[in-house]
UniProtKB/Swiss-Prot annotation:
<dbReference type="InterPro" id="IPR021127">
    <property type="entry name" value="CRISPR_associated_Cas2"/>
</dbReference>
<dbReference type="GO" id="GO:0051607">
    <property type="term" value="P:defense response to virus"/>
</dbReference>
<keyword id="KW-0378">Hydrolase</keyword>
<comment type="function">
    <text>CRISPR (clustered regularly interspaced short palindromic repeat), is an adaptive immune system that provides protection against mobile genetic elements (viruses, transposable elements and conjugative plasmids). CRISPR clusters contain sequences complementary to antecedent mobile elements and target invading nucleic acids. CRISPR clusters are transcribed and processed into CRISPR RNA (crRNA). Functions as a ssRNA-specific endoribonuclease. Involved in the integration of spacer DNA into the CRISPR cassette.</text>
</comment>
<protein>
    <recommendedName>
        <fullName>CRISPR-associated endoribonuclease Cas2 2</fullName>
        <ecNumber>3.1.-.-</ecNumber>
    </recommendedName>
</protein>
<dbReference type="GO" id="GO:0004521">
    <property type="term" value="F:RNA endonuclease activity"/>
</dbReference>
<dbReference type="GO" id="GO:0043571">
    <property type="term" value="P:maintenance of CRISPR repeat elements"/>
</dbReference>
<keyword id="KW-0460">Magnesium</keyword>
<keyword id="KW-0255">Endonuclease</keyword>
<keyword id="KW-0051">Antiviral defense</keyword>
<comment type="similarity">
    <text>Belongs to the CRISPR-associated endoribonuclease Cas2 protein family.</text>
</comment>
<feature type="binding site">
    <location>
        <position position="6"/>
    </location>
    <ligand>
        <name>Mg(2+)</name>
    </ligand>
</feature>
<dbReference type="GO" id="GO:0046872">
    <property type="term" value="F:metal ion binding"/>
</dbReference>
<comment type="subunit">
    <text>Homodimer, forms a heterotetramer with a Cas1 homodimer.</text>
</comment>
<dbReference type="InterPro" id="IPR019199">
    <property type="entry name" value="Virulence_VapD/CRISPR_Cas2"/>
</dbReference>
<keyword id="KW-0540">Nuclease</keyword>
<dbReference type="Pfam" id="PF09827">
    <property type="entry name" value="CRISPR_Cas2"/>
</dbReference>
């Protein structure tokens, strides 16, 4: 799955939400780039992640997208630059 978020940080509450969302996402997924996370997690973990995120976000100010792939569907991941892959250190 891929998780992407844009948290409104115009006020201190937004800045706190941003940190909480990042920490929550890191519990389940690999941090790929600023507000982008990816990983292969179970349906149960997806449910927990969604529940935790929904408890943090401001529904009127923040934006969160989750891309999920159904079982058996393979996602081709291609890095187009020469920079190191930030997920290389994960097992």
């Amino acid at each position: 799955m891929i998780l992407i978020y844009d948290i409104n940080t115009e006020d201190n509450d937004g800045k706190r939400r941003l940190v909480k969302i990042m920490k929550t996402s890191r519990k389940y997924l690999s941090h790929v780039q600023k507000s982008v996370f990816e990983g292969d997690i179970t349906e149960g973990q997806i449910s927990l992640l969604k529940k935790e995120i929904m408890a943090i976000v401001n529904m009127k100010k923040d934006f969160v997208i989750i891309y999920s792939l159904r079982d058996g569907v393979k996602l081709n991941r291609e890095i187009l630059t020469d920079t190191p892959d930030p997920t290389d250190n994960f097992l």
